[in-house]
């Protein structure tokens, strides 16, 4: 492709609102253009990258036995009402009416649509298992779109759905798709980790995320320094502490702590280690008017996903109102504790072996020092309430945990019968008896993969594309292409020979200054660059550099095609 026939639109500066490297570089490199908040046009250069990702995904989906179809973006409300997600999904689901006043939505996922298709088309165990996928535009009305295509309202996603006669069959396909995802992200050249994950609003049982490792990632993953264990921090369990509880050394003393409402201010006021404090979180129970007290160490981070799964806790997790707290505890938040509280109390595992805690006294502006479980209040039920921290024992018993940030680019779920039961997706088994199908779903955020790859592969000059994702494999940068016959002839010859060798080549024949052409080639991140100029040609050479190391070297003009093709095929 010649640049004069293509479209290249680069910027020297990124817009002020762009925070992430990927957002800045995608705008500067002209991969995307913003149309509105969270809405982008994929420009020709960006679309080539998107298509490269899609091609890898399609090849691996076919290898895994998934069949491609294409479902609609606009979906009828009755399917979502049937599954129960019409109301549950909330405002992220963009709802609309047609001219006949019928309700529809812009699909953020397609579980309902594919379930409806399958229940109409498959009725026998002989037709199972089946695995379908499509690559389609999705829409989620994000309350605050940000970070470019990383969290846009409109995005491209590959979602696959499998249907099975039994759970064993689902597990087999789940593993096949898990393996396919590993191959996809490996082929794309990304550093990633599959991690055990929460199922979230999709539902079901087993679930894994595929996280591209990047310091800018919104997610935190925990992994063992010894084994293959890895999980999203939301799911990684903490283990009960071993050994005996420390002996109580202090008496229970009520201390006046005026205007002390936070753990940090308590630590400063009493000049104590934060590890000796307990913080109180009050949530609603399943029964009307019931409150449940949750206790964890002051330096630990509360995990609401774990808390929501506790017996007796209302789902979804609901924090108690200030009025309800005052009514049952006699104090406001910031001064709460278990002493005198008659309701259910859960305490985190990390508090079980400790003694002489500092905790709220259930009286405004007062705390207790020297608090001990069993002596000053009934023994709570010790459970897992917190996020893991670095150095915690790995849940598999092998090694210690480390933490890293990641960007979720893929997610696989064992949905089981969450949707098939609600929508009566059934089949006749080999005994002629009607059974509900087992279901799995498997998603990859195609547009997010592009942004995540840039987060992982960039420098101060621009993008550094991996081999599989680059919009072009090679860029030829001729100096004075329009004015120098020698340069033009050499550039055209190398261009033709590389095309004949099967390379994906961009010949930048734009009438621009040398500095613009060179800067654009680095900004665009094309892996291999050949610079052709009159001075080097007089010595029989061209300049060759790989974008990842940017070390330019003189290569004989008669050897450059072989040199580049060898690198491409390595």
UniProtKB/Swiss-Prot annotation:
Any Pfam family the entry gives:
tRNA_edit
Q: What is its main location?
A: cytoplasm
What EC number is given for this enzyme?
6.1.1.15
Q: Which GO terms describe its biological process?
A: prolyl-tRNA aminoacylation
For the keyword Membrane, the answer is no
Q: Does the keyword Signal apply?
A: no
This protein's assembly is summarised as:
Homodimer.
Domain comment text? Consists of three domains: the N-terminal catalytic domain, the editing domain and the C-terminal anticodon-binding domain.
Q: Which NCBIfam families match?
A: PRK09194.1, proS_fam_II
Q: To which protein family does this belong?
A: Belongs to the class-II aminoacyl-tRNA synthetase family. ProS type 1 subfamily.
**What's the protein name?**
Proline--tRNA ligase
Q: Which organism is it from?
A: Neisseria meningitidis serogroup B (strain ATCC BAA-335 / MC58)
Q: Which gene encodes it?
A: proS
